[in-house]
UniProtKB/Swiss-Prot annotation:
Disulfide bonds: none annotated. PANTHER family: TYROSINE--TRNA LIGASE, MITOCHONDRIAL, TYROSYL-TRNA SYNTHETASE. The keyword Amino-acid biosynthesis does not apply. A motif ('HIGH' region) lies at residues 40-49. Belongs to the class-I aminoacyl-tRNA synthetase family. TyrS type 1 subfamily. A motif ('KMSKS' region) lies at residues 228-232. This is Tyrosine--tRNA ligase. Its main location: cytoplasm.
Length: 406
């Protein structure tokens, strides 16, 4: 049987290891308990987290046991990795709400039945931690000089790094130590932006417990130009259908650049590699077939087959190939709003994130109403605009929404 490491490397997941040869041997010889941490900074996971869950799912399918750690404790501080400013402090109530929402989402991707996976919250051991004890037990193993050389701190030193955030590395390292002691967790997986924190955890376990510990990082989801993927005009591409509709989610993947199709098929689907290679080799207009497969498969994993089919039908209806238009994202508008400016209504309906963005679309010719380009910022929405009680809004080349009179 192939080592899961070969599968992960072939599909492009692995970026860095702490101990590659030992990791390979470990994954071949035993069922390994590993963990990935997720900070509950929002009430939904986004597509950047999805790649981490696919990483976990491949490991679980190979017989290893995942621990999904939700950082209810570390979220009270905020991870400085990749940030140029200090994150806004969240209330305990907000964190608790976000934790509950994320738990529910994770259960769609990872099998937690019969102890096949474990869900933990580091608030359980961090929030009641005695500070002096923590410094004596954990702080003694960390070198400030070494910490300051870490990439996650380097970029913050000039702009100001709070002592609060400086503790984050210790807390994340302590998470690994706790999971190692309680669940015999031997490995941490995470995004490549977490590398410094992960090394700290590996070293803490090895020093404090005299146990072997390992880490490997997953590539971040970037396009062929090196930019992070998963951003839309309305912000992040969320996994929550209330934040990003299944149709909008489907359309995002349907419209990826040709150069990004292979990478997305590898990382975000379970399609066998032979089929990935076949789809990725398509050229010209045929590459659109690969994009349709990508969009359907990713939407099916996140929202289920029924919603993926509805999104596919809506896309086909809008692009002149028949299908069911009822699945296009729809906003119900009261008749009392007739005569209001279109851009105000689009902002209220969250079709555009702001009036400024709406004006930019109009200026660039990227906003249409019932097939006609909107040229006037102050265009009002009148009853005459509604055909059979609805209007069709088009943003850019392929983003559609309906507004119906309630």
């Amino acid at each position: 049987m192939a080592n899961v490491l070969d599968t992960l490397m072939e599909r492009g997941y692995i970026k860095q290891f702490t101990h590659e040869a030992e990791t390979r041997e470990l994954l071949e010889k035993e069922k390994v308990t590993f963990y990935i941490g997720f900070d509950p900074t929002a009430d939904s996971l986004h597509v950047g987290h999805f790649i981490a869950m696919m990483f976990m799912a491949h490991m679980q399918k190979a017989g290893h046991r995942p621990i999904a750690l939700i950082g209810g404790g570390t979220a009270t501080i905020g991870d400085p990795s990749g940030k140029t400013d200090m994150r806004k402090m969240m209330t305990n109530e907000t964190i608790a709400h976000n934790v509950a929402c994320i738990k529910k989402q994770m259960e769609k991707f990872i099998d937690f039945s019969d102890d096949k996976a474990i869900l933990v919250n580091n608030a359980d051991w961090l929030l009641n931690q005695n500070y002096v004890e923590f410094l004596r037990e954990v702080g003694v193993h960390f070198s400030v000089n070494r910490m300051l050389s870490a990439e996650c701190f380097k970029q913050r030193l000039e702009r100001g790094l709070s002592f609060l955030e400086f503790n984050y590395m210790l807390m994340q390292g302590y998470d690994f130590y706790v999971l190692n002691k309680k669940y015999n967790c031997k490995m941490e997986l995470g995004g490549d932006d977490q590398w410094s924190n992960m090394i700290a955890g590996v070293e803490l376990v090895r020093k404090k417990s005299q146990e072997s510990a390992y880490a490997m990082t997953c590539t971040l989801l970037t396009n062929s130009e090196g930019q992070k993927m998963g951003k839309t005009v309305n912000g992040a591409l969320w996994l929550d259908p209330e934040k990003t509709s299944p149709y909008e989610f489907y359309q995002y993947w349907r419209n990826v650049n040709d150069a990004d199709v292979e990478k997305c098929l590898k990382l975000l689907t379970f399609i066998p590699m032979d089929e990935v290679r076949r789809l990725s080799s398509l050229e010209g207009s045929q590459i659109n077939e690969a994009k349709k497969v990508l969009a359907f498969e990713v939407t099916k994993l996140v929202h289920g087959e029924e919603e993926a089919t509805k999104a596919q039908q809506a896309a086909e209806a809008l692009f002149g190939k028949g299908g069911d238009m009822s699945n296009v994202p729809t906003y119900e508008m009261g008749k009392d709003k007739l005569g209001a400016e279109l851009l105000d209504i689009l902002v209220e309906a969250e079709i555009v994130p702001s009036k400024a963005e709406g004006k930019r679309l109009v200026k660039q010719g990227g906003l249409s109403l019932n097939g006609e380009k909107v040229a006037d910022f102050k265009k009002t929405l009148e009853e005459a605009d509604f055909e059979n009680g609805e209007v069709l809004i088009k943003r850019g080349k392929k983003n559609y929404n309906k507004i119906v009179l309630a």
